[in-house]
Amino acid sequence: MQGAFLITFIVLTMTLVSIGNTEESGGQTSSNDKTEPAQSRTKRRSREMGRVVRGLQMLRLGKRDSVSTSEDPGDIDDILSLLQAYQEQNPEFAFNEEERELSGDELEVPEHHRFRRSTENSGVAPQEVQQSQSFKDSGEHELKLEEAEPYLYFPDGDFYYGDVDELLEGDNEDGSADKRQIPMLRLGKRSMSMLRLGKREEDDADFDEEKRSLSMLRLGKREDDNFEDSFDEENDKRSLSMLRLGKRPMSMLRLGKRPMSMLRLGKRPMSMLRLGKRPMSMLRLGKRPMSMLRLGKRPMSMLRLGKRPMSMLRLGKRPMSMLRLGKRPMSMLRLGKREDDEEKRSLAMS
């Protein structure tokens, strides 16, 4: 009996403890559900008021052009009332004394998006100031241009200061040619009228030997004025009309020492192209022409094997008509001596 009583007592205590725990957990969840919306609302409200404060500060600095003078003063009063309410709820975002004393009449509203508080309020309009300043600058610039000394620019980087008329008239009184004229457009330090490969043109007669005219453009040494005196050196002076490879003109382009019209292999012209010492018309193998091509020392018409013509092709020293085995002709096929011995023997017996 006592054991059963103890078991029932333990079961009852466990059920009571579990019921109490569930009630406590339910109360905590309900309290959390009530406090979380309140905290979220305060956070959202603080964020919104922070944005309003920043927007007003930007408007006071004149960095937003969305607000204009056409707005009603009632809107400004509403904004100030919101700011005061936000200040009372959030003392950490409190304004300083100057901002607290600020009223709707003292609030500065920009009239232009480029308005700045640091600028002084002058009675002159900005457009008039800008026009007067531009006129002043243009006048000073025109005076500077009139007072500036005239100069001319040359392509080689030289500048000429002074009177332009004197430059256009010619050289200096002493005859020096340091100043170049404008109509002599040039490449580098040379005049365009004497475009050439070499040194630049000089006006003095002492430099005649170094002048190279365009009419005698050449590859080689330059042309001298005393060409007739040095005619013996004509191989060293080549004009454009005699462009060449070597020491002869282009009209006789050649391989060797003969003109192009006699192009050849060896010492004879192209018209007698040959293999050896005879012309091409007698192409041959050896010392005879092509018409007598042969194997040996006789012409092609008598092709042979040995020293006799092709018509007497033979094996040995006799003609083809007496083909034989050994030293006797085919008509007397035999195994023994030759026909000549038989003839000699018959003559001896007679």
UniProtKB/Swiss-Prot annotation:
Residues 23-53, 65-178, 201-210, 223-236, 339-350 form a propeptide. The keyword DNA damage does not apply. It is found in: Secreted. Residues 1-22 form the signal peptide. Residues 22-49, 115-140 are annotated as: Disordered. The modification Leucine amide is found at L61, L187, L197, L219, L245, L255, L265, L275, L285, L295, L305, L315, L325, L335. Residues 22-40, 120-136 have a biased composition (Polar residues). Myomodulins enhance the relaxation rate of electrically-induced contraction of the penis retractor muscle. This is Myomodulin neuropeptides. It comes from Lymnaea stagnalis.
